[in-house]
Amino acid sequence: MASVFMCGVEDLLFSGSRFVWNLTVSTLRRWYTERLRACHQVLRTWCGLQDVYQMTEGRHCQVHLLDDRRLELLVQPKLLARELLDLVASHFNLKEKEYFGITFIDDTGQQNWLQLDHRVLDHDLPKKPGPTILHFAVRFYIESISFLKDKTTVELFFLNAKACVHKGQIEVESETIFKLAAFILQEAKGDYTSDENARKDLKTLPAFPTKTLQEHPSLAYCEDRVIEHYLKIKGLTRGQAVVQYMKIVEALPTYGVHYYAVKDKQGLPWWLGISYKGIGQYDIQDKVKPRKLFQWKQLENLYFREKKFAVEVHDPRRISVSRRTFGQSGLFVQTWYANSSLIKSIWVMAISQHQFYLDRKQSKAKIPSARSLDEIAMDLTETGTQRASKLVTLETKSQFIMASNGSLISSGSQDSEVSEEQKREKILELKKKEKLLQEKLLKKVEELKKICLREAELTGKMPKEYPLNIGEKPPQVRRRVGTAFKLDDNLLPSEEDPALQELESNFLIQQKLVEAAKKLANEPDLCKTVKKKRKQDYTDAMKKLQEIENAINEYRIRCGKKPSQKATVLPEDIIPSESSSLSDTTTYDDPSDAFTFPGQRSSSVPHSPRILPPKSLGIERIHFRKSSINEQFVDTRQSREMLSTHSSPYKTLERRPQGGRSMPTTPVLTRNAYSSSHLEPESSSQHCRQRSGSLESQSHLLSEMDSDKPFFSLSKSQRSSSTEILDDGSSYTSQSSTEYYCVTPVTGPYYTTQTLDTRTRGRRRSKKQNVSTSNSGSMPNLAQKDSLRNGVYSKSQEPPSSSYYIAGYTPYAECDFYYSGGYVYENDTEGQYSVNPSYRSSAHYGYERQRDYSRSFHEDEVDRVPHNPYATLRLPRKAAAKSEHITKNIHKALVAEHLRGWYQRASGQKDQGHSPQTSFDSDRGSQRCLGFAGLQVPCSPSSRASSYSSVSSTNASGNWRTQLTIGLSDYETPAHSSYTSCYGNVYNPLPSPSRQYTEISQLDGTDGNQLEDNLESSEQRLFWHEDSKPGTLV
C-alpha cells in the first residue's frame, strides 16, 4: 500500500511540475510575441519615417537598360518622366526616342508605363523598401525595322525582342526558339567553334525561355537542337544575324502586343491585347489567335470608369434599319472589367497606342522609303565590335546619375564619343537657331520703332525707347492736330450737390471732346470717307453733349433750381450733303417717333395726325440733299432722300438760300408721279426693289391754312395721269407702303428724277402757306375714318389682308405692264372719288373698267394716237349688267365733257407759237407709253376698284401760260418727248397675294435739258378759274 501511495504522490508531483513548466513557457512565449510585435511596429514606423524623409529629398531608382546595364538615379520630386527618358536615351545616343518608354511593376504585379507629361514620383510606384526598379523598353512597335532610320534604334529593338522572348512575353514555339538561339550565338560569339564552347555560351546567354525548358526537361536536347541550327548559319555577320533574328520575331503574331488580364460581363477571363494594329480579345489559354480584333480605324471612342473599360466600335455589318435611329448606325460598345488600377493602365495604353497610330498615319508621307535589310546589316556589323567591347568594359563600372529639378548631372557614366560629323551638325543647327533669333529680333525692333513714332505723333516728343544705331539721329516727327485739352481750373469738387457737380464735370469734359472732334473734322487733306466719319463722330459728340445738358436741366428743375442756359448748337459746318448718312438711314418703327411739319415730307405710311412739336426741340428746318441728273446717270440708280432724324436735340441754324429768299429750301422730289412709286435699280439687272410712298392728310396742316385758298403741290418737269388740283385739300388718297421686287429690262435707258431749280424753289417759297409737300405723287387720302381703324391711319409694313386682294392678279407674274394713271387704294372704299357723290360706281364696275380700259389700249397699240396729257381716256363700250348702265352713262358723259374742254384748250395753245408751254406740251407728248415697252413687271392692282381720276371741263378762259403746275404731283416726272409703246395688258388670271405695282418712265437728256431751259426762262404762275366748282381742276 505504501509503495502504491508513494508512486501516486510522485506522479502527482511530476504532473504538477510539468503543468507549471508548461504554463511558464506559454506565458513567456505570449509575452515574447507581444513585445516582438511592439518592436516590429516601432521599427516599421521608423522605417516609414525614414522613407518619407527620403522622399522629400528624392527617391532612389534603378533603371534597367536593354543591354543589361543598370543606372542608379536619385529622382527629385520635380523630375518629369520625359526628362528621365531623355537621360536614359543619352546613354545610347538615341535619336528616335518616340518608340521607347519606361515601365515599372506596381504592388499588384501589373506592368505600368510612365506618362511622359507627369512627374516620375507622381505615379503609383511600388512602396517597397530599397530603390525603385524601372525598365527601359520599347513601347511602340512598327511593322519592320526597315522603317527605322538609326542603326542604334535597330539594335535596341533587337535587344528588346531578345529580352521579351526570354521572359516569355512573346509566345514562340520550341523549334522557333532553337533557331532564334542559334542567331543569338552567331551575333554574340561569331561562327561555330566547338560544341563545348557553344554549350557554355548558351548557359550565359538569354536563349531559352522558361516555357521551353518546361516543355523539354532535357537541357542537352535543347542545346543539341540549337547547335544544329548554329552550324547551318555559319559565315553570317553580326548584322545579318540581327536582321534574320528580327525577321523571324516580327512575323510572330504576339510580337508588339501588350497583354492585360480582364473579364467580360459574364465574368469569363480574357486576355486583352493592345498593339499598333488595334485591340484584340484572346482566350485565356491562347495569346496567338484573337477571338475579336478591333482595328484602330473601326474604333470611335475609348473610355473607362472605375472597373470598366469600354470601346465604341463601328461595324458596317451592323447597320441599323430602324427609321427612329438618330445616332450613328453600326456602332456597338464592347466592355471589359478589371480592378481600377489595371483599367486605368489599359486606358492609358490604348490612348497612347491610338495616338501613335494616328501620328504614323500622318507622317507616312514624310517618311522616306524603307531601307534595305542588307544595308542595315552592314551598318550593324561595322559598329558591333566597338559597341560590344565598350559594353563589356562598362559593366564593371559603378554608375550613379543625379537628377535635380530637371537638370541632369552624370558622374561615372559613359563619356560618349561624339564624332566630328556630329559636331558639325550641331554647329550648323545652332547657327540656324541664331539666324532665326536675329530675324525675330529685327522684327521686334521694327515694331518698337513704329510704336515710338506713333507716340511721337501724338505727344510731339520722341520717346527715349526709340532704338537708334550708332551715329543715327532720331527722325523728325510732325505732331498731328492734337485733341488734348485742359479742364476748367475753377471746377472743384462740391460737397453741396455731388450729383449735379458730376453732371457739370461730364458736361465740361464732353464739351472739350466736342471741340477736339471739331478740330479733327475740320482737318484738311482728308479723303471723303474719313471726313464723313469724323463729321459723324462730331455729330455724335454733340448729341451726347445735348443729352448731358438736358440731364442737368432736368436735375435742376427737379431740385427747384433754375435751368442753366447753355447753348448747345449744332454748328453750320456740318454740310447736309456730306453728312446725309444721318438722314438717309432714318426709319420710323413707331408712328409716335415721326413728326410732320410744313414743308416737310411725311413718312411713307399714313398715321394719326400729330400736333406740332415745341420750338424747344430745335427743329426749325430740315435739310434735303440735292441730287442732279448727272450724278444719277453716273451711279445708274435713283437716290431717295429721307428726312433728318426728328429726335435730334439740336437747334439747326438757318441757312439762307442762294436766291435771297427767306423761305426754307424745297425738298428733293424723288418719286415717280405716275404711280407714286420709286423704281430703284440695284446691282441686279433683272430685279429692282420698289418702295411706294403715300401722301397723307395732316389735320394740323389743314387747320393752319385758309379754306378759301387753293391747296396744291408744285413740281418741275413732272407728269401725272391725274390732273386734279383740289381747291380745298380736304380729301387725299393714300397708298400703302409696300416693298417688292419687279423684273426690269436688261438694257434700256436709266431712269432718274429732276429737282427744282432755284427759281422754281423761290416761287414755291413765296406760296409757302398754300403749298404742301408729300411723300409721293399719289392722290390725297379720301378714305373715310370708319373704313380704317377707328378713324386713325395705322402704320403697317405687312402686306394687306386677303380681303383686299384681286383674285386675278399675281405680284410676281411676268406680264406687259399697263397703268392708266389711276391710283391704287387701300381697300374697297378708299380712293373711289367721283365728282358727283350720288353716282359712285361699284367696286366691281371699277375693276371691269380697268380690264376693258387696258385691253382696248393694248389692242390699239399700233395706232399710237396722241392724247392730251391731262385728258382721261375714253373707255370702250362693253355690255354690262343693267344695274350698271346708269353709272356708265354718267362716266361717259363726264369723259366726253372733259375731253372737249382739254381739246379746246390744246387748240388754243397751238396759236401761241414758240411759247414755254409749246416746249412743255411737246415734251409731254403722248400718254400712250406710261409703261416701258417690253418691261416685265408684276401687275398688282390695288383693289377690286381702281378708280380713275377725272375732272370736269370748263371754259378755256384764263391765263394758262404756265400750265406745268397743273396735273403735276409733288415728285419728279421724266421729261421724254416721245414714247415707244402703248399701254400693256394688265390682266393676269393668276392669283395675287399682295397689292403691288410699278411704273417706269423714260428720260431723254436732250429734251430734258431743253425743257429745263424753257422752264427757267418762263414765269411759273398759276391761275384759277373763277367759276370752278369744288373738286374740279381746270
From Swiss-Prot:
It is found in: Cytoplasm, Cytoskeleton; Cell junction, Tight junction; Cell junction, Adherens junction. Residues 59-361 form the FERM domain. Pfam families: CUPID (PF11819), FERM_C (PF09380), FERM_M (PF00373), FERM_N (PF09379). Signal peptide: none annotated. One of its GO terms (biological process) is establishment of epithelial cell polarity. It comes from the Eukaryota. One of its GO terms (cellular component) is cytoplasm. Residues 635-650, 663-674, 769-781, 906-920 have a biased composition (Polar residues). Residues 576-589, 675-685, 713-722 have a biased composition (Low complexity). Residues 417-450, 531-561 form a coiled coil. There is a cross-link at residues 882, 1029 (Glycyl lysine isopeptide (Lys-Gly) (interchain with G-Cter in SUMO2)). Keywords: Cell junction, Coiled coil, Cytoplasm, Cytoskeleton, Isopeptide bond, Phosphoprotein, Tight junction, Ubl conjugation. Member of GRP1 signaling complexes that are acutely recruited to plasma membrane ruffles in response to insulin receptor signaling. May function as a scaffolding protein that regulates epithelial cell polarity by connecting ARF6 activation with the PAR3 complex. Plays a redundant role with FRMD4A in epithelial polarization. Interacts with CYTH3. Interacts with PARD3. Interacts with CYTH1. This is FERM domain-containing protein 4B. It comes from Homo sapiens (Human). The lineage of its organism: Eukaryota, Metazoa, Chordata, Craniata, Vertebrata. The gene is FRMD4B.
